[in-house]
Amino acid sequence: YFIKDGSGFVLSSERDGWNHIYSVNIASGKQLQLTRGGWDVIAVNGIDEANQRVIFTAAKSDPKNQDVLAVPLNGKGVMQLSPLGGTNDPEFSTGFRYFINTRSTLNTPPVITLHNSKGKQIKLLKDNTKLAATVKEYGLVTKEFFTLTTDQGIELNGWMMKPPAFDSRQKYPVFMTQYSGPNSNEVLDQWGGRDQ
């Protein structure tokens, strides 16, 4: 994304081993890392010119989450715009004055809300209480997160669904799927719809 005055642009790069945001000054070629830490930027949504900041989504609070965040063009402090936890999927107005956020968690259907540029919720647009009640009525089992540690000490996230009336003293058959590819987080704190 180019800065409107033509002085530079922002991009994401894995230069430090994590996907982070950098600004580049066109005249000097100087690069400034705007975000840093042991987490990945998922997407750059654009530049909020009025507030001189970059709006983006990232797995900052937890690798299973997707947060909506902002960072000033000078890189001084990341601001949380969405509620913590779960998966937040924003749609921004022109100029980034408002955004509609669709947020869900592993066992909670999407809730759609309207927020101002500082992240304050202005209005609840859709709460999906009817869907949540219907799911509860069917008595479906809930998903649970777990973490495995490999022989190399790497922690891997997973989720499981146990049979109804699960008894830990019993043995059950297991159906397992896995993904071994790079750069794709398949274990998300997000409503799964058909997987519920």
Which residues make up each language-model segment?
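Short, solvent-exposed loop/turn segments that connect beta-strands within catalytic domains
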Residues: P63-K64, N74, D167-Q170
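Serine-hydrolase catalytic core recognition
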Residues: T87-Q196
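Multi-bladed beta-propeller domains
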Residues: Y1-K4, S13-E14, V24-A50, A58-S61, ...
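Structural motif
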Residues: G17-Y22, P63-L69, N107-L114
